[in-house]
C-alpha cells in the first residue's frame, strides 16, 4: 500500500508536469491567445505568485491540513489517474470556465480596446501601404505573415486596399484614357469638410502638362489636373492619359472635360440642398502645353507671343526684342485677327472663356527654370564679357555650402554647388532668386550684372508677397520691363528669347490672380511626380495609376496638416525664475510654421519686433498646454540695399547687434518667419514668403 508521503510526492510531480504542458500549449497556440508568453509564464512572475501563496499558508499546510481527509486524497488519486490516461486531450480553458486562464487577468476594457484596434488594423495597414507606395507583391508577402499571428486581415493586397477589379479605360487621341469627373472629387471634398465657400462659389483651376513615365521608352503621362480654390492646395486628377506621345487631337482629349464643365457652369453643383456656382478661372500650363491647348504657334515660332502682336526676329534663334507692342485681346483671339499666330481652333473657345488673361504664364517654368537658369548658364559658360572666373565660381559654391545650415525647414532642398546647377530643381532656383542670390552674389558680380539680377529678384519678390503686391505692383512692372531691356544690352540681343520677353507681361497675371504662387505649377509638378511613382510595371500604366488613385481615396489626408507638438526637451535655458518649473523644448510645430531655438528656424517677428527665439517653454493651463518663447530682438536694423528701392520696404534687413534682453511672449504672438543668411559680422534677415 502506498504511503502518504509517496502520494504527496506523486501529486506534486503530476501538478508540476501539467503546469509545464500548459505553458507549452499556450506558446504553441498563440493564434488562440495572441498574448506574450512572457507576460503570463515568466519565471519571475510565477515566483511572485508562489511567494503570495506561501505567505498565506503554513509550511506543508496544503498537504497536511487535517481538513484533507483520506477520502479527499483518494479522490485526487482518481483524478490523477484519469489525467495521466488522457494527457493528449488536455485543452486550454475557455472563457466560460471559472478556472484560471491567462485571459482572467485581462480587464474587459483592455479586451475592448484590443478588439477596436484589430478592427482598425486593416485601415491603418492600407494607409501605410499607400503612404509608402508599397507594391502589391510586397504586401501580398506581408499579409500571410501577419495572419499567422491571428490578425484578422485579408489574404490579398487588393482586398485590403479595396482595389477596383475593372477599370474601364478607353482609347482617346491615340492613347489610353480614363475620366474621373470633377463632380466625383467635389463630393469627396465636401465629405471630408475640405471646402470653405462663404458665397456659394466654387472656383476651379486646371493644369495640363506632360511627363515621361520611363527613362527607356517614349511612354508619357498627360493628365488633366484640377484644384479648387476654396479647398486650398488640394490637387485632384480629372482625367488620366497615357500614350507614346502627347494626345494627337486636343478636341478628343478635352471632350469629356468640356461636356462636364459646361454642365457645371450652366447648372451649378448641388450638395445637401445647397447650390454652388462653378467657375473655371484659369488654365495653368507651361509654354508647349499652352500652345497645344490654345492651338497657336509654339515658343520657337515667329508669332509665338500670346500677349502682344509682335513678330519675332531671327538672331541665330527666334528673339522678341520689343517691349511696347500692341496687346492681344480675347476678341482678337476668337476672330483670329492674327492668322499667323493660330494653327487651329481651340475647343476651349466654346466655354466663352477669356483665351488671353485666363492662361497665366506660370513663373515656375518662365522665371525659375527659364530666366534664372539662363542667367546662371551665362555666368558659367557665356561669353567672356559676362563669364565668371573659376575662382569666383568656387567662392560662390563655398558660400552656398556655408549657408546650408541656415535654410529653414520649409525649404525641402538646400543650396548646392554651382557645378550642379543643371540639376537644380525649380524650388532651388526660386530659393536662389528670392533669398540667397542677392546675398551670396554681393561683391562677387560686377555692379552692372548684380544690379540687373537684383532688379529681377526685387520684382518677383513683390509679385509673391500680398502686401508688397498691393503697394508696389507698378514698380514691379517697371522693373521687369527695365530688366528685359538691360538684359539684352548686358548679355547680348540674342538672349532676348521667349522666356525673357514674357517677363514684361508677368505683372498682368498678378493683377488678375493675386500673388504668382496662386497660379503657378509648383503644386501640379509635385503631384505629377507622385503619379509617376504609382506605375510599377510597363504594362497598362494608365490602369495602374487609376487603381492606385481609387485606393488612395482611403488614405487619410494629412497634407499641410500639422499637429501642435513640442519636441527635444532640454534644461539649458534661458528661462526666468518664475518659470523654472516648466518644461523647456528646442522645437515646436505650429499651424503656421515650424519654430525652433536653433539656427535656421529661430528668426521671427513677434509683437512687431524682429529677433530670434532663445527658448521654447511649455506651460499647463488646466487640461491644455500652451507655449511661451524667450525672445531677444535686434538692437538695430539697417538697409541691405537702397536701389531699386530700400530693402527695408521689402522686409530685408542687415542686423548685427542684439539687445541682450530676453522677453517672454506667447507662441501665438509669432507672426512672420524670417530667413537668416550670414553676411560680414552679422546677418541678412528677410521675410520668408514660402511656408
Residue ranges and their predicted role:
Residues 142, 209, 257, 283, ...:
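Short, conserved catalytic/metal-binding motifs centered on acidic residues
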Residues 115-201, 548-549:
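Electropositive nucleic-acid engagement tracts
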Residues 222-272, 310, 314-361, 621-691:
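E2/UBC-UEV (E2-variant) core
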Residues 52, 56-58, 63-75, 79-87, ...:
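Terminal interaction-prone segments of large eukaryotic proteins
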Residues 1-117, 613, 631:
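Polybasic, low-complexity terminal segments and linkers that are predominantly intrinsically disordered
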Residues 148-151, 163, 266-426, 440, ...:
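Domain-level detector for long, ordered catalytic/regulatory cores in large eukaryotic signaling
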Residues 118-122, 135-139, 179, 201-204, ...:
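Generic preference for well-ordered alpha-helical elements
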Residues 184-188, 195-197, 202-243, 439, ...:
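Acidic, metal-ligating active-site segments
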Amino acid at each position: 500500500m502506498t504511503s502518504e508521503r509517496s502520494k504527496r510526492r506523486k501529486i506534486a510531480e503530476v501538478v508540476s508536469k501539467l503546469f509545464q504542458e500548459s505553458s507549452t500549449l499556450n506558446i504553441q497556440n498563440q493564434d488562440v491567445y495572441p498574448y506574450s508568453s512572457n507576460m503570463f509564464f515568466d519565471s519571475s512572475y510565477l515566483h511572485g505568485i508562489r511567494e503570495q501563496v506561501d505567505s498565506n499558508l503554513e509550511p506543508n499546510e496544503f498537504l497536511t491540513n487535517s481538513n484533507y481527509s483520506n477520502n479527499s486524497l483518494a479522490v485526487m488519486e482518481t483524478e490523477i489517474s484519469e489525467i495521466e490516461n488522457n494527457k493528449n486531450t488536455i485543452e486550454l480553458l475557455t472563457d466560460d470556465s471559472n478556472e484560471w486562464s491567462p485571459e482572467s487577468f485581462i480587464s474587459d476594457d483592455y479586451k475592448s480596446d484590443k478588439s477596436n484596434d484589430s478592427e482598425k488594423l486593416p485601415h491603418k495597414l492600407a494607409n501605410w501601404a499607400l503612404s509608402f507606395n508599397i507594391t502589391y507583391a510586397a504586401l501580398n508577402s506581408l499579409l500571410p505573415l501577419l495572419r499567422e499571428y491571428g490578425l484578422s486581415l485579408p489574404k490579398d493586397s487588393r482586398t485590403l486596399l479595396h482595389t477596383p477589379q475593372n477599370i474601364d479605360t478607353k482609347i482617346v487621341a491615340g492613347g489610353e484614357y480614363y475620366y474621373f469627373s470633377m463632380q466625383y472629387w467635389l463630393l469627396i471634398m465636401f465629405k471630408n469638410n475640405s471646402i470653405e465657400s462663404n458665397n456659394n462659389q466654387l472656383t476651379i483651376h486646371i493644369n495640363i502638362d506632360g511627363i515621361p513615365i520611363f527613362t527607356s521608352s517614349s511612354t508619357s503621362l498627360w493628365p488633366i489636373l484640377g484644384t479648387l480654390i476654396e479647398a486650398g492646395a488640394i490637387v485632384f486628377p480629372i482625367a488620366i492619359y497615357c500614350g507614346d506621345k502627347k494626345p494627337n487631337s486636343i478636341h478628343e482629349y478635352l471632350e469629356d472635360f468640356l461636356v462636364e464643365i459646361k454642365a457645371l457652369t450652366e447648372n451649378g453643383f448641388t450638395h445637401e440642398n445647397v447650390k454652388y456656382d462653378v467657375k473655371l478661372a484659369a488654365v495653368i500650363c507651361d509654354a508647349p502645353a499652352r500652345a497645344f491647348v490654345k492651338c497657336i504657334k509654339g515658343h520657337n515660332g515667329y508669332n509665338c507671343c500670346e500677349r502682344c502682336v509682335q513678330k519675332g526676329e531671327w538672331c541665330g534663334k527666334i528673339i522678341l526684342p520689343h517691349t511696347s507692342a500692341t496687346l492681344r485681346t480675347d476678341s482678337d483671339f476668337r476672330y483670329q485677327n492674327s492668322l499667323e499666330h493660330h494653327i487651329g481652333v481651340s475647343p476651349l473657345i466654346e466655354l466663352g472663356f477669356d483665351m488671353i488673361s485666363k492662361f497665366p504664364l506660370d513663373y515656375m517654368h518662365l522665371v525659375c527654370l527659364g530666366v534664372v537658369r539662363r542667367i546662371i548658364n551665362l555666368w558659367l559658360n557665356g561669353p567672356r564679357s559676362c563669364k565668371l572666373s573659376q575662382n569666383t565660381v568656387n567662392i560662390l559654391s563655398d558660400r552656398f555650402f556655408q549657408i546650408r545650415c541656415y535654410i529653414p525647414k520649409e525649404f525641402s532642398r538646400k543650396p548646392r554647388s554651382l557645378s550642379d546647377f543643371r540639376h537644380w530643381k525649380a524650388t532651388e532656383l526660386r530659393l536662389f532668386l528670392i533669398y540667397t542670390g542677392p546675398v551670396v552674389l554681393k561683391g562677387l558680380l560686377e555692379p552692372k550684372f548684380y544690379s540687373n539680377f537684383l532688379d529681377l529678384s526685387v520684382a518677383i519678390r513683390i509679385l509673391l508677397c500680398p502686401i508688397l503686391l498691393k503697394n508696389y505692383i507698378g514698380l514691379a512692372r517697371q522693373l521687369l520691363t527695365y530688366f528685359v531691356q538691360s538684359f539684352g544690352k548686358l548679355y547680348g540681343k540674342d538672349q532676348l528669347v521667349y522666356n525673357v520677353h514674357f517677363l514684361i507681361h508677368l505683372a498682368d497675371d498678378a493683377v488678375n490672380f493675386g500673388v504668382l504662387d496662386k497660379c503657378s505649377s509648383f503644386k501640379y509638378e509635385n503631384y505629377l511626380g507622385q503619379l509617376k511613382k504609382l506605375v510599377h510595371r510597363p504594362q497598362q500604366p494608365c490602369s495602374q495609376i487609376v487603381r492606385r488613385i481609387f485606393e488612395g481615396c482611403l488614405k487619410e489626408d494629412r497634407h499641410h496638416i500639422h499637429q501642435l507638438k513640442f519636441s527635444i526637451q532640454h534644461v539649458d535655458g534661458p528661462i526666468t525664475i518664475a518659470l523654472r518649473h516648466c518644461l523647456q523644448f528646442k522645437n515646436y510645430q505650429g499651424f503656421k510654421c515650424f519654430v525652433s531655438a536653433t539656427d535656421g528656424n529661430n528668426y521671427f517677428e513677434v509683437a512687431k519686433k524682429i529677433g530670434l527665439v532663445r527658448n521654447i517653454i511649455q506651460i499647463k493651463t488646466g487640461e491644455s498646454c500652451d507655449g511661451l518663447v524667450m525672445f531677444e530682438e535686434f538692437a538695430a536694423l539697417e538697409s541691405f540695399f537702397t536701389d531699386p528701392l530700400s530693402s527695408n520696404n521689402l522686409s530685408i534687413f542687415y542686423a548685427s547687434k542684439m539687445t541682450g534682453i530676453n522677453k517672454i511672449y506667447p507662441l501665438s504672438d509669432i507672426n512672420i518667419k524670417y530667413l537668416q543668411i550670414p553676411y560680414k559680422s552679422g546677418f541678412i534677415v528677410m521675410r520668408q514668403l514660402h511656408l
